[in-house]
Amino acid sequence: LVEECTVNWAIVRTIIVYGVVDNMSRSNLVLWAKSALQKGETINVINDQFRAPTLAEDLAEGCMLIADKKAKGIYNISGRDTYSILDLVYQIADFWQLNKSLIQVVSSTTLNQPAKRPPRTGFILDKAINQLGYKPKSFREGLNIIDKQLKGFEK
């Protein structure tokens, strides 16, 4: 239906967005893991689901590129690399030098998730990269950006 529409349109698909905003209504994987580990809380982290996390600024940039170029179609906008959720949380712990022994490895079957989730979610970004000039940051670069933003909120 949308493809038959005569007006310019675009659909953006994304995965597991993370970032910082003032007065957030809900957290995200990075802020949740960082906060819990800083408080010394044990956290259950699944080892059997894989995602390509998207820095909020990258998602915003992708949307701006679509608007600026008056692009039409469906665009995948996410991080470039796919990691297990467990690996992401280990990277978060390493980045902020937090205690990884507080991370309890579990299977997604042990969680009462309201909706079934695919084991692996990652996108082919070629269209966004080639047509829009989209340049997603690495997860490590995203953590650096979040760290600077959080320090700005502390002032």
Predicted regions and their residues:
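Glycine-rich Rossmann NAD(P)(H)-binding loop
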Residues: 19, 45-50, 75-82, 131
